[in-house]
UniProtKB/Swiss-Prot annotation:
Record has Cell cycle as a keyword: no
Quaternary structure (record): Part of the ribosomal stalk of the 50S ribosomal subunit. Interacts with L10 and the large rRNA to form the base of the stalk. L10 forms an elongated spine to which L12 dimers bind in a sequential fashion forming a multimeric L10(L12)X complex.
The protein's name: Large ribosomal subunit protein uL11
CDD domains listed in its UniProt record: Ribosomal_L11
Family of this protein: Belongs to the universal ribosomal protein uL11 family.
Record keyword Ribosomal protein present: yes
BP terms from Gene Ontology: translation
Post-translational modification: One or more lysine residues are methylated.
Gene this chain is encoded by: rplK
Any single Gene Ontology cellular-component annotation: cytosolic large ribosomal subunit
Its job: Forms part of the ribosomal stalk which helps the ribosome interact with GTP-bound translation factors.
A GO term, aspect molecular function: large ribosomal subunit rRNA binding
Length: 144
C-alpha cells in the first residue's frame, strides 16, 4: 500500500545552498521532517548547477515523517534577467524606458531549457509565454 501523503511544501532554494535556516527549516519542521537529511540530499542533487541559481522544489511529506522531492528548472524571470544582463526588472512597466532587451534566439534557447516545466504544447507556445514575461518585466523583444 502507498504511503499516506500529509502535504506538499513548495520552496525556492538557491542551488547547493540549502541550510536549516528559514525558509527551509521552519517549513520542514512544521511537518516533522528531517531538515538536515533534506539539505544534504538537495545540495547533492544541485551541486552540478550554477551556485545560487534559484531552484523551485516540491517536497512531498508522508505520514511516517519521510519525504520525497522534485526539483524543477529555475523561474523564467531568472533566465530572462540573465539573458538581458540586468539585476532586476522594471518597477514601472510600460511607463518608463525599457530596462533591457532580449532576442528571439535567446527566448527560443530559454524555451528549449524550460520546455518540460512550462504548460505549453510546443516550443513556439513556450516562446510566446516568455515574450509575455519579458514584456511584463520591462524588457523589449528584438528579432535576431
Amino acid at each position: 500500500m502507498a504511503k499516506k501523503i500529509v502535504g506538499y511544501i513548495k520552496l525556492q532554494i538557491p542551488a547547493g545552498k540549502a541550510n536549516p535556516s528559514p525558509p527551509v527549516g521552519p517549513a520542514l519542521g512544521q511537518r516533522g521532517l528531517n531538515i538536515m537529511q533534506f539539505c544534504k540530499e538537495f545540495n547533492a542533487k544541485t551541486q552540478g548547477l550554477e551556485p545560487g541559481m534559484p531552484i523551485p522544489v516540491v517536497i512531498t511529506a508522508f505520514a511516517d515523517r519521510t519525504f520525497t522531492f522534485i526539483t524543477k528548472t529555475p523561474p523564467n524571470t531568472y533566465f530572462l534577467m540573465k539573458a538581458a544582463n540586468i539585476k532586476k526588472g522594471s518597477s514601472t512597466v510600460g511607463k518608463a524606458a525599457a530596462v533591457g532587451s532580449v532576442t528571439m534566439a535567446q527566448l527560443r534557447e530559454i524555451a528549449e531549457q524550460k520546455k518540460q516545466d512550462m504548460n505549453a504544447n510546443d516550443v513556439d507556445g513556450a516562446v510566446r509565454m516568455l515574450i509575455g514575461s519579458a514584456r511584463s518585466m520591462g524588457l523589449t523583444v528584438v528579432e535576431g
